[in-house]
Amino acid sequence: MKEIKDFEKIKIKIASPDQIRNWSYGEVKKSETINYRTLRPEKDGLFCERIFGTTKEWECYCGKFKSIRYKGIICDRCNVEVTHFKVRRERMGHIELAAPVAHIWYYKYIPSRIGLLLDITASSLNSILYYEKYVVIEPGDTDLKKMQLLNEDEYIEARERYGMSFNASMGAEAIKTLLENLDLDELSSKLRIQMIDKDDKTDKKLLRRLEIIENFKVSGNKPEWMIMEVLPVIPPEIRPMVQLDGGRFATSDLNDLYRRVINRNNRLRKLLLLNAPEIIVRNEKRMLQESVDSLFDNSHKRKVVKGSSSRPLKSLSDALKGKQGRFRQNLLGKRVDYSGRSVIVVGPELKLHQCGLPAKMALELFKPFVIRRLIESEAVFNIKRAKNLIEQEVDEVWQILDFVIKEHPILLNRAPTLHRLGIQAFEPVLVEGKAIKLHPLVCHAYNADFDGDQMAVHVPLTPSAQAESWALMLSTNNLLNPANGHPIVFPSQDIVLGLYYLTMEKKNIVGEGKKFLNFSNVILAINNRSLDYNASIYVKIDGEYKKTTAGRVIFNEALPKGIEFVNKTLSDLELQILISKVYVVHGSSTVIEMLDIIKELGFKYATKFGCTISMSDIIVPDEKKTYIDRANKEIAKIQNDYAKGVITGEERYNNVVSVWLKTNEELTNKMMEILKKDRDGFNVIYMMADSGARGSRNQIRQLAGMRGLMAKTSGDIIELPIISNFKEGLSVIEFFISTNGARKGLADTALKTADAGYLTRRLVDIAQDVVVRIEDCGTINGIKVETVKNGEEILESLKEKAVGSYSIERIKNPITGEIVLDANEEISEAKIELLEKIGIEKLVIRSVLTCEAEHGVCQKCYGRDFSKNKPVNIGEAVGIIAAQSIGQPGTQLTMRTFHIGGVAQAGSEDDKISLKNAFILNSIEGFNVNVDNGILFTRKGTLKIINVFYEEKIKNIKEIKVLDSQRVIKGIPLFVNKKGVEILSSYIGYAKLRDDKFLIVSEEQEVALKAGTKLEIGVGDYVESGKVIGTFDPFAEPIIAEVKGKIKFKDIILGTTLKEEINTETGNVEKRITDNVFESLDPRIFIIDSSGMEVASYVLPGDAYLQVEDGQNINIGDVIAKLSKGSEKTQDITGGLPRVNDLFETRIPKNLTEMAKVSGIVQFKSIQKGKRLINILDEYGVEHKHYIPAGKHLLVRDGDVVKAGDMLCDGRINPHDVLEILGGISLQEFLLAEIQDVYRKQGVSINDKHIGVIIKQMMKKVKIVAVGDTNFVYGQKVDKHTFYEQNRKVIEQGGEPAIASPILIGVTKTSLNIDSFISAASFQETTKVLTDASIAGKIDDLRGLKENVVIGHLIPTGTGMGLYKKIKVSENIDAKV
């Protein structure tokens, strides 16, 4: 039997008048609701029983028929059908309108749909509908034009002049006639011709008109249906009227709105019968139009209709819109029965899969199950008696409850549920009291603590729901974080401290240096008090004695069998690494066993350690005063430079901040060093921080070092630091400065949490229909991944980037030629290690970004599911997981400022350049000049170097086994030394013989240098690691003379382009180029040689400080002008979250850079309209124009050679430019890198594939640039797959395909343009989405998750996938056991 649920698609259309009459069970003629005496509905009123059905079950209105046996009979007296009262939720009525009215959605919303069809403006349309102007419908043979508007006087004049030879009218009747007369086919072809004539310049209005006309044609809707003759009346149960205690009635606002419509309609009908004067009728029609507008969308009107308490009435649209609307409040978020909530407390005695459930709560939740068992066990014979027993709480009830909850999982949820681990299943254990007990190790997944947090309990009822809870949601099946595959169930705080204490080593204590044959002897010695936990001992393990400690023996003895001996001090990170390792090697069951052991041990030894903290544990370094004095001296020097005018105010500020940051860092290092040595490393504060149990280096710095610099509310750093720490106590001024940061922290947290929540919501909306649908899409495209480095520091290894993905190409060992990795093979941890060993640093892998699956993604392109560490299953909702993985840390990061209490965090800039590895300088690129003792870079430059990994003097070598410049990989023989030992390589690189040394060096690498860098080494030099090779000014960018000569100013005019400011602090005159832009003036400096020739020209950007005078003689390398860097801002995620928002919304940055559109030679041209024209001459001699706002600091000079995509001036990159100039793949890489950068800076690890899923959705659409023989419109934005499908059909028929270019759309816009109108409507702009969908007659295929939740289907992922719906379970009787 087919149920109403068995449908696969939903279509939305505009209802025709006949359709509305068809739905209706009768016309509502009166505005009455119910009779005040009988409290029964009035006949023909808004609650009429004849129309909407009976209010009493199986009884007619007059009471003639009273029983289910008369079902379906219509009473001959009152005409009410004998039926179920629930029909009052389904039956609709209608109102026949005395005059047509326009639907507000189609005429008032911008762009006005009726206006677009008829090509009239919204204001003109309003004036027609509200009976202010006439519109000419048929001009006949007069001078009037069709669609011309006439006011009253013009109309009277035209009537006198032309008589009845033309037709003009007003109101919705006129618009209806115009819409009926439209020929859509003719209009469509006319507009298409206009579009082609316009060529490149797409007219948005034309495009919109064409789209709306095509939508009407395809959907079968008629334009005149946007004008209503019949108004549907929704069922009365949906707009109920209920009696309150005081005898008064509360009614839905809709009833008031309907009453206004009916009253006005009836009055209009009467006026028409009486042939009332036109002006009165017209006014009544206008009021009818207004009342219908209010009914459909009251909040959209300029004058809102208000109820008795002067509150705006809630119309039909308002019931759908917003957070409290039908979609978000009732369809997507429902209240759940069989649920409860209570405070949580810690349950250290629980196993990982258990939770403690208060007995009282359990009894209430499992009541029906208990009742059933009571009846089955014949303790009682009816439900009423069973309920009584339960209320009395007899012993039998508790026994049955124990039996019922055994192996019946319950779900625990903590709000806010930021990712899927916010709901997990546990087996309940009955506990006394009223609090839920939670296992301490799952707190991290819930982000729960025990300071009053509450949690909700839900009971899965059906066997299938219980099975899913056991198999998929049990806490022991959720050990890994879906965002990155790291363990999410790991010990913290007390447990960590206990294990750290247990596994630490201490000198000179009982039992030190003893030897033991086995573990049990060690434990015996400890129990006899002849051995201390932290004593260093020797134990026989696998046949040989190993140096370890007694505590480590206890730890290893407790671990499950088969785990390698752990011989180190365990901090929280070490424990996480151990858990990961055990998971990979031994699987989840061993990890679960191990986690409970770790928990027991941790709590036990934390208790035994019983650490306390006192003032004497906080040690302030004696060197503090020295450091502070030194900083003050440096600052005095900076102030002195500023007073002399050597540096600008901004540079002074930046330098001061930098000095304090450096001093604070040095002091902290010293403090940590002292704490580490204190009590042999057993200083409690140091132990807490070092183990990762509580507190951080940053917090200890404030206790024992100095509090440091604070941030202002604006994010600027206050240059006066707090020199005291909390042990010494703060002075009044220091305390005052502190309050600023502390308040900022709290305010930020509150505001940003909402922001991050909204980001998650948008991401979920855009990605909710991305599900793994097929095994392999068969693509041959992939993306290139390599190690992410910052200088020489590895930020993300190749392993992190590529593990769990599938390869695109086959990779062979460069030396043996054997296949290491085949195409389409999963890249496992072992494979990565093999690849790294043979020196492979770049890989091309399959990625969600290049997946060609029509809907969702395929298994191979997605790769590994990180929550299981296995290839992803078909049916996994990877879109939602991606959105949660990105949004969840967003919310976490907003909390960061809170804990440090507003202490400023910014990198202190170093003015010296040194590299970690030793290296050889191969070559120098970029403009540079020789100055005394070095090379000065006048513009940005690059050093090409090779790093030296290994060196050995040739005199120590007997025989070299490799050739010069030969590639070497790990494990191959390099040479035989003088002792005859063969030395194997532990590095990947190239062998190099240089002078008297044998080296292993890297491939050539680039080191970028800033303008103004002075280099102290030369080409070919061998430089030791850590040696300073050059210096630069980190806070200013200089413009440097590249030739010798005399300065000549051009367009530098005081008061116009030059501003002289007297510095009030120093009394010096500072000359600054203004930001004002003048067409004719282009401030620049020429250098003139001895013959009077101009040999160099330098453009001066706005805000540049001049360092020279007109006519001054200058040498090579002198600074002409300099630009100060903006003052340091504190970098916390408050900078980061808005950045992520901007990237996902693809907003154009404020301070925009201009990118070179092509590769070629730069040519400077004039300034036009405040913008400097720069041409780039490409290889074919074609000029490409670039306009850059004058006053911007240019990064190129006349004659420079640039590559496409190079930045021409400073500023932020616009992602849309990246797409246009460098293409889709570069854009994907750019967005991925930018978003990852924000999260990485905060130490948050998110796998690339999650961000990839979102970016893929943002690039789903293409823009048509050539129509060909398809039905597309020029400039239209269509889905990629729709585009390919249409083209395929056209090519098959021998036609010309369309051409499109890729576009990038932000997440909000993408969510609104999603294929499913139900999903889009439930996101934002509900009424707009539904308006457009109804015109287009859209069909929702119910592919995504949201639309299925809204209509009450199972979601089409996992066990709810279509694949599994048709599976029938058959019993095979003959099956052999």
Curated annotation (Swiss-Prot):
One of the Pfam families matching this protein, by short name? RNA_pol_Rpb1_1
Q: Which GO terms describe its cellular component?
A: DNA-directed RNA polymerase complex
Q: Which residues bind Zn(2+) 2?
A: C777, C851, C858, C861
Enzyme category, top tier: transferase
Q: Name one GO biological process term.
A: DNA-templated transcription
According to its UniProt record, which reaction does this protein catalyse? RNA(n) + a ribonucleoside 5'-triphosphate = RNA(n+1) + diphosphate
What is written in the cofactor note of this entry? Binds 1 Mg(2+) ion per subunit.
Signal sequence interval, chain numbering: none
Q: Which UniProt keywords apply?
A: DNA-directed RNA polymerase, Magnesium, Metal-binding, Nucleotidyltransferase, Transcription, Transferase, Zinc
CDD domains in alphabetical order? RNAP_beta'_C, RNAP_beta'_N
- Where is Mg(2+) bound in this sequence? D449, D451, D453
Q: EC number(s) of the enzyme?
A: 2.7.7.6
Q: Which SMART domains match?
A: RPOLA_N (SM00663)
Entry-linked InterPro entries = DNA-dir_RpoC_beta_prime, DNA-dir_RpoC_beta_prime_bact, RNA_pol_asu, RNA_pol_N, RNA_pol_Rpb1_1, RNA_pol_Rpb1_3, RNA_pol_Rpb1_3_sf, RNA_pol_Rpb1_4
Can you name one GO molecular function term for this protein? Answer: zinc ion binding
User: For binding Zn(2+) 1, which residues are annotated in this chain's numbering?
Assistant: C60, C62, C75, C78
UniProt superkingdom: Bacteria
Q: Which cofactor does it need?
A: Mg(2+); Zn(2+)
Q: What does this protein do?
A: DNA-dependent RNA polymerase catalyzes the transcription of DNA into RNA using the four ribonucleoside triphosphates as substrates.
Q: Which family does it belong to?
A: Belongs to the RNA polymerase beta' chain family.
Q: How does it assemble?
A: The RNAP catalytic core consists of 2 alpha, 1 beta, 1 beta' and 1 omega subunit. When a sigma factor is associated with the core the holoenzyme is formed, which can initiate transcription.
Task: Identify this protein by name.
Answer: DNA-directed RNA polymerase subunit beta'
Annotated gene: rpoC
